[in-house]
Amino acid sequence: MSVRENIINFKSQLPESVKLVAVSKTKPNNLVMEAYDAGQRIFGENKVQDLAAKQPELPVDIKWHFIGHLQRNKVKFIAEFVDTIHAVDSLKLLKEINKQAVNNNRTINCLLQFHIAEEESKFGLNMQEAEELLKSDDFKALQNINISGVMGMATYTDNTEQVKKEFSNLKTYFNKLKSTYFSQQTAFVEISMGMSGDYKLAIEEGSTMIRIGSSIFGARI
């Protein structure tokens, strides 16, 4: 199927509560525009250099999500336009995002990344680290970031029960943070989990945002 057909197919099967992030990393602008023309507005990139190059050449109403591991010294290159940064796993990174948001007179949405998988290669916080971050005076002083939810990546495995358990754990973390730290904040709503291979399981476990690349655009170039 074409990119357009894939977008329409995904949109038809997703619950209204679930947002689709079309992961356009490594893909040329003409394929991004094919998805855009099919109604897609949220796109995800995982390399600062690629995102900074694409953004000026594509429609201004695209909501760009940065979904990769973000180095602090590169935040400034996307701070002017990025809508949401998915993989935030340290106070130092949050402080830099806030600094660059102030410089650009805007607020940037951030998702706290939790380590829910077995692989050590995955980044992310555990619950204790997240709570220490949120309790800190340094965090409370940040005025130009909006913590809009959590994200995580499950173990790459065929064991569906394990994947479901990991997604369920992330939903539990979200609920605990919501009730303890964000009960008065209506913007804390997102659970970003699920990719091309496991998004159906993620939706069953409460995902509000799935990140889909190969099932829309085909295999990586």
Where does each model-flagged region fall?
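Conserved alpha/beta-domain cores
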Residues: M1-G197, I203-E205
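Gly/Pro- and small hydrophobic-enriched strand-loop and loop-to-helix capping segments
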Residues: H86, S207-I221
